[in-house]
A protein has these predicted regions:
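Carbohydrate-active catalytic/glycan-binding domains of CAZyme proteins
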Residues: 1-234
């Protein structure tokens, strides 16, 4: 219907936790206020949508009782009604999980978190499965596949550009969400992984920007999550 549905985390400072919301954007750039569609008693963040067998699914990061893991939901009535299916990969604390299909396998890229759920943003972990709905995800033998605070943590969906596979990565050096980079995936198999940095982006292209968090592009629409410095009196 010529509209974009932007899935995002809203953080409620009064509750000290996040919930998931949707902004609807039309082709003229008009957008709605965020509409909450998923909230729990604990923190939710980083929604990632994927399609499997003509059905939409959503994974998101969760921090509950100091544990960080992934939850899987199935869409029952797009875009606001989603049904919980199961937890994924509960034995390793993970944040910012990103689903990707490649060479007949499903892959989850996620940053390893500390036991208290606070990510160091330094280690990128990789898991694979033949079925994205499975609770059997195999850790890659090279984990962590990236150990670098400047690009390890996922910063949005993996995408194709100019016949290359691009993985956005967060730069969390000095501060969380300092910027992001485009990293080309060179090898992605059950036994191999290799990537190289293509370009890094800093929050220097607009006055007031102090951080870049995520990058997503789909069907001609690009969404960048930024942080700005504002006066509380404005």
């Amino acid at each position: 219907n010529e509209k974009y549905y932007i899935f995002l985390e809203e953080f409620d400072n009064s509750k000290n936790k996040g919930h998931l919301s949707i902004i609807i954007l039309d082709k003229n750039g008009n957008y709605s206020k965020p509409v909450k569609f998923l909230e729990r008693d604990y923190h939710l963040s980083y929604p990632s949508i994927f399609e499997f067998e003509n059905q939409l699914y959503l994974i998101h990061s969760t921090i509950h009782n100091s544990n960080a893991y992934i939850e899987l939901f199935k869409c029952e009535d797009f875009p606001f009604k989603w049904k919980f299916i199961r937890k994924l990969i509960t034995d390793i604390p993970l944040v910012d999980a990103t689903m990707f299909f490649h060479n007949n396998l499903w892959w989850i890229f996620a940053a390893e978190a500390e036991n208290n759920g606070t990510s160091k943003s330094e280690k990128l972990m990789l898991f694979y499965s033949i079925n994205p709905l499975s609770d059997n995800w195999i850790p890659h033998p090279l984990n962590p596949i990236v150990s670098n605070i400047q690009n390890a943590r996922p910063a949005g969906n993996i995408f194709h550009m100019n016949n290359k596979i691009i993985r956005p990565g967060q730069n969390c050096f000095k501060v969380y969400g300092n910027g992001f980079s485009f990293n080309e995936i060179i090898k992605l198999t059950k036994n191999e992984y290799d990537e190289k940095n293509l370009e890094s982006f800093k929050p220097d292209w607009k006055n007031g920007l102090i951080g870049l968090h995520t990058f997503n592009h789909d069907h001609g629409c690009t969404v960048i999550d930024t942080r700005m410095k504002r006066s509380r009196f404005n």
